[in-house]
């Protein structure tokens, strides 16, 4: 939290007006209690950020994996995630984020029914206008590796394929997107971006809400590594990746290149 002024001043000066916050707590436990602690890392960061940079738009990741000692996205029952028990904790997390100053919450856990649970909980606590960006079309992808290493959120056993989608599957992605809109999602996200632009295109034609896509850590790392070796033009690749997402139908693009893209847009190198 003490680094917030430095970390937020740079994107704001670059012309970035929206950021997403992820939390890595000092202590993790079986039920991820740090996720919904009113004095948790994200909650503290939101309160401080709102004071120092009130014009920035703050979106928060709502999930348990960074907070659980086992690295899974919910409460365990044996070696399986208990979907319904997890919904209650996700709703508590979303409420705590909004009450700390979040402008939007983004559940990324992939539990069934979590958008409805969060929407009902927010409304019951008077947060009727708080929007939800749902990670509706989230695939079990190898592209997440660098983020999981940085956040220390890799599962200690098994994997997340029981609640994230098989990357072969198109129909399930469409079904999830439509279901989450019915449950109250204001924005639908497709994740990852680069290898799933077909889904960005299809979802954008099927839903009546904005579509976001997330260019994840593995995509960023590949470009960085290839650029370091002198094999590619990093800036041109970065711009092509962003434009391809918008061309496919995305209206929101989440990226680790936000500052650099903002500069390119400001200088008229991309539209």
Where are each of the predicted segments found?
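Alpha/beta enzyme core
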Residues: 1-271
